[in-house]
Curated annotation (Swiss-Prot):
Limits of the C2 domain: 656-784
Catalytic activity: a 1,2-diacyl-sn-glycero-3-phospho-(1D-myo-inositol-4,5-bisphosphate) + H2O = 1D-myo-inositol 1,4,5-trisphosphate + a 1,2-diacyl-sn-glycerol + H(+); a 1,2-diacyl-sn-glycero-3-phospho-(1D-myo-inositol) + H2O = 1D-myo-inositol 1-phosphate + a 1,2-diacyl-sn-glycerol + H(+)
Domain PI-PLC X-box per the UniProt entry, residue ranges: 316-467
One Pfam family hit: PLCB1-4-like_EFh
Organism: Rattus norvegicus
Protein name (database record): 1-phosphatidylinositol 4,5-bisphosphate phosphodiesterase beta-1
Additional detail: The receptor-mediated activation of PLC-beta-1 is mediated by two G-protein alpha subunits, alpha-Q and alpha-11.
GO molecular function, one term: enzyme binding
Compartment(s) of residence: Nucleus membrane; Cytoplasm
Compositionally biased tracts (Acidic residues): 507-518
Domain called PI-PLC Y-box: residue spans: 540-656
Species classification: Eukaryota, Metazoa, Chordata, Craniata, Vertebrata
Alphabetized UniProt keyword annotations: Calcium, Cytoplasm, Hydrolase, Lipid degradation, Lipid metabolism, Lipoprotein, Membrane, Nucleus, Palmitate, Phosphoprotein, Transducer
Compositionally biased intervals (Polar residues): 846-868
Amino acid sequence: MAGAQPGVHALQLKPVCVSDSLKKGTKFVKWDDDSTIVTPIILRTDPQGFFFYWTDQNKETELLDLSLVKDARCGKHAKAPKDPKLRELLDVGNIGHLEQRMITVVYGPDLVNISHLNLVAFQEEVAKEWTNEVFSLATNLLAQNMSRDAFLEKAYTKLKLQVTPEGRIPLKNIYRLFSADRKRVETALEACSLPSSRNDSIPQEDFTPDVYRVFLNNLCPRPEIDNIFSEFGAKSKPYLTVDQMMDFINLKQRDPRLNEILYPPLKQEQVQVLIEKYEPNSSLAKKGQMSVDGFMRYLSGEENGVVSPEKLDLNEDMSQPLSHYFINSSHNTYLTAGQLAGNSSVEMYRQVLLSGCRCVELDCWKGRTAEEEPVITHGFTMTTEISFKEVIEAIAECAFKTSPFPILLSFENHVDSPKQQAKMAEYCRLIFGDALLMEPLEKYPLESGVPLPSPMDLMYKILVKNKKKSHKSSEGSGKKKLSEQASNTYSDSSSVFEPSSPGAGEADTESDDDDDDDDCKKSSMDEGTAGSEAMATEEMSNLVNYIQPVKFESFETSKKRNKSFEMSSFVETKGLEQLTKSPVEFVEYNKMQLSRIYPKGTRVDSSNYMPQLFWNAGCQMVALNFQTVDLAMQINMGMYEYNGKSGYRLKPEFMRRPDKHFDPFTEGIVDGIVANTLSVKIISGQFLSDKKVGTYVEVDMFGLPVDTRRKAFKTKTSQGNAVNPVWEEEPIVFKKVVLPSLACLRIAAYEEGGKFIGHRILPVQAIRPGYHYICLRNERNQPLMLPAVFVYIEVKDYVPDTYADVIEALSNPIRYVNLMEQRAKQLAALTLEDEEEVKKEADPGETSSEAPSETRTTPAENGVNHTATLAPKPPSQAPHSQPAPGSVKAPAKTEDLIQSVLTEVEAQTIEELKQQKSFVKLQKKHYKEMKDLVKRHHKKTTELIKEHTTKYNEIQNDYLRRRAALEKSAKKDSKKKSEPSSPDHGSSAIEQDLAALDAEMTQKLIDLKDKQQQQLLNLRQEQYYSEKYQKREHIKLLIQKLTDVAEECQNNQLKKLKEICEKEKKELKKKMDKKRQEKITEAKSKDKSQMEEEKTEMIRSYIQEVVQYIKRLEEAQSKRQEKLVEKHKEIRQQILDEKPKLQMELEQEYQDKFKRLPLEILEFVQEAMKGKVSEDSNHGSAPPSLASDPAKVNLKSPSSEEVQGENAGREFDTPL
C-alpha cells in the first residue's frame, strides 16, 4: 500500500468477550445521591456486550448503553454517600469494607454532561471483577467500530431486553425504535405475520433473528443491492458462483494500493469460507453459490468494514522521538463551558484523559484561603476555582487507563507564593510517585543535538512543562521578582512567542500566551506577556526536563541552538502568521522540537480553530477546547481515533526526515509521496432519522490546503424518506490527494432543514475501497445504532493524465490495441477516407516518425539515472534497423525475434565493485591511517635511538676521563721509576687499573646494548600489534562497505533492469507492428473487399501474436532476472568469503613477522655497533677489548629508510 508500513501488522485488538458472571447476573444495591432509598437489583450484561441492564424487585428492566459508558470505578475512586443514614443502609454484607465494595459507572453523551450509576456489591472481589469487565467492554475499540450487521443486532437485542413482566416484546418499543414511518412498520409486521397494533405485544419466541431480518427487509427494502447483485453476474440466475464472488471481492472490494505479496487476493477456498459463513441456504453454500440474501449479509458483515481493524489497532512505530508525533492536546482543560463564566471541574481532567488526550493544561493560581492551597481557575474571570491537589489526584487516577504513553502537563503558573509553589511540587512528587519523570533518561541527556526520547521510552511517565528557573539569577533577586510579581494577566506562557521584528508585538492585539488577548487585559496588551507568569521556584523547576518552554525568537535561532528539549507555544494567530510566512521552516522546526498551538483569547465561547491547519506544519500539541463539540473538535476526534486511540499519531515521513524539506502549501506531487485518487459515490441511506423528513448527504475533504475541499459534494434531498433514500448521482472524484497520510474524508447526513444527523471521519489512507456501509456517529463521535449511509468508494494511486494511456497500454495491451483500432475505424468512417487510412498505415515512414514520440512519453524514461552501473551488451541485430524500401522481410522465428530485443545483462564483478567511489574513498582513508600509525612509531624509534646515543656518549666520555687520569698517574710513576730508590711494583698496579676500567666500560656497553635491543624489540612488537589490530578492523569495515556497495549497485541494476524490460516490450511491439505494416503493404495490390477481410484477419492474428510474444518475452526476462539475482547472491557470498580468508592471511603474516623480529633487531644492532666501534677504535676511544670484539649495540641515529626497513614497501597497504 502506498505509504504503508513494511510487513503485515498482526492484529492485537481483542474481540468483545463477556464473562459468564456478567451474563448470569449478580446482586447489587443501587443508590442515588439525592435519595435515601436503596434498591436491590440484579445486574447483567447481554452476551454481545451491547447493554448493561438491571432488574429490580418489581421485575422492571432498565438499560444502559455501554457505548455511553466513560469509566468504571471502585474502591476509593468510586463515589461514596455523604448521608450517614444512607451509608448505614448500604453497609450490608459481611465480606470486605464498604469502600472497597462500591462501584461507580460514569456515563453520558459527552465529556461535560455525565451521570453516575452508583452500586454496592456484597463482596470486594465481585466489585473489582465488574469494574474491570465493564471498563474493558466500554473501551473495546472493536465494539466502538462494529459492523453494520452488529448494529442491527444491537437494535434487536434492545427490543429483546425491554420486555414486559410476562416476557413479551411490546410493539410500542418497535414503533418507537423505527419511528420514522409508522405505516411502513405496520406493513412490515404484517408481512411477518405479526400483530401490528401499537398496544399489542408479541412472544419473544415469535420474534426470532430470522423473523427480525425479514421484518427489516420489508421495512427497508434495498433495490440498489439487487441491482449490484445482478450487474455482477446474477442476471439469469438467483445466485453468484464462487468465481463471480471471488472476482467481486478482488476487483471491487480489494485495495489496489496493497502489496500483492503481503496482501494477496482471495482464493477460491477463502471465498468459499465466506459464502458458508454468510449464505443462509446451506444447500447453496455447499455448491459455492451465494443468494442475494447472503450477499446482503456479507456486505454488512465484519469482513467488509470501511476501515481495516489494523488501522484501529496500535499499528504505528512508537519508537521515534517525541517531536515526530501529533499529540492529542487540551486547552484550559478544567473548563466546562465558556472562557469567562461557568464551572471549573476536576472531573474534566478524568474525562479528557479517558477520551485519549495526552496533554492537559493546568492554570495555577495562588489560593486565598487560610490553608494557602493553590487552586486552578481561569484568572480574572467569573469561572469557579478547583483544588490543585484534587486535580493532580484525578490525573494520577486516569492517566494511563486508556493509553500507556506519556502524559504532558502544561503548567500555566501564576502562583506568586514560594510556599504554595513548593506545595505544588510536593503534591506532584507524592501523588504521581515513580510515574513523574524527575530526571532525564541516560540515553537522552539534555544536550544540544540529542533528540527527544520516544513515547515507547516514556511509557507510563508524566512530564511537566513549566518555566525553568534560570541558574544565572541569584536566589535573592529571584525572591524579589517573585514577591513583586503582578498577577494582572493570565497566559499559557509556558513559552512565549516573541516577535522577531521590532514593533511586531505592539502591532498585534493577540498576545502570545493563552487568552492574552482577553478584553480584561487592555493595560498589558502592548507590553506583551513575558512576565505574566510567576517565577518558577527551585522545587517546581526541578520537575522540568524534556519540555522546557522558551521565548520563540526565530526558526534560525532555534536551529542554531538545536536543543530538542526546548519548546515554544504559539497563539493560533501567531502560529498562522508563521505558517504563512515560513511554512518550510515551521515544518523543519517541528522535526526536532515541540510546539504548542492554543486558541486566541477572543474565543470566549470556547470555540475552536481547525487543527488541520497546524497538523499540516507538523505542530505536535494542537490544543483545543474539549468541552466544545464543533467541527474542529470532531476532526480532532477523528484523527486520534486510530493507532489504538493512544493519543499519539506518527507524522508523515516527510515531516520527520531531516534530509527532506516539505512545503505544506505545495500544489504539485511531492517526489517520494504517492498521491491518491479517491472517488465516492453516495448510493443510499438507512434509518437516517426518526422523523419522516427529507435527508441529504454531504462530503468534505480535509488535509493540505491543496487537498481540502469543504462541502465538495451534496446529494439531492430525498422526498420525505429517511428510512431508505436512494441517490442515483454521479460520484464525487478527488482526482489528486497530494498527501493521503494527512487527509481525511468526512461523510455527514442532514435533515432537509439542515439539522445534523450524524457523520463519519475516515483517514484517506485507511479507507477500504468497494461497497461499504458508513455507520454514522454523533457529534461526540459516539456510534449511532441505526443511521447508516451505503457508499461505493474507489481509491488508487494517482496517475497524471499525461501517463494514463501509457499505463492502460502496459496493463492491458489487448484492450489498448482494440481501442486504437476502433478509434481509427470511427475516424475513417467519419471522414470517408478509407483508402487514405490504408495508405497511411502502409507507409513505413509513419512508424519511424512515431518512435521518438513514444520515447518521449514513456514514464520509464523520466528520472532514470543513466550513469547507473549496468553494462548491457548490444543485441546481435540493431533494434532500429529498417528493411530496404519495398522489400518484405520473412517472418522471424519466435526465439529469434525475442532474442533480437533481449538485452544481455551481466552482474558487476568484485573488482568492478571495488572501483566504486565510496569504496575507494574508504581505502584511501585506511591508507592514511596506516601511514600515520607507522609515522608515529618511527618517531618513537628515532627518539629511543637518540636516547641510547646520548647514553653511549656519556659512558664513553666517562671512560676517556678516567683513562686519562690513570695514564697521567702512570707517567708520574714512570718518572719515579727512574730513581734508584723507588720500588718496581707501581707499573703493574696501573696496568691492573686500566684493565679493570676497560672491563667496566665493556660491561656497561654490553648492558646498554642489551637494553637497547630489548626496547627496540618491544617498540617494534607494539607497532606490529597496532598494525595487526588496525588491519583487522580495516578488513571488517572494507568487507561491510563492499557488501553495502554490492547491494546498492545490485538494487540499482535490478531497477534499471525493469526499465530495460519495458523498453524491450516496446521494441518487440514496434517490430511486430512493423511486420503488420509490411503485410498491409503486400495486401495493397488486392481488391478492396479481399483487402478488408485480410486486414481484419491480420488484426486478429496480430493481437494473438502480441500476447504470445509478450508472454514469452516476459518468461525470458524472468529467467534473465532470476539468473542475475542468483549471480548477485553469488558475488555477495564471495565478498563474505573473503573476510575469513583475509583475516587468516593477516594472522599468518604477523605470526611470521613476530617470529623474525628478534633476529632482525639483533642484526640491526650488530651492524650499527660494528660501525660505531670501528670509528671509535680509529680515534683510540674504544676499549681494546671492544676494538678486537665489538659488542653489538646500536649507537647511532639511523635514517628513516633504515628504521622502516622492510616496512617501506608494505606500510601503506590496505587489506583489499
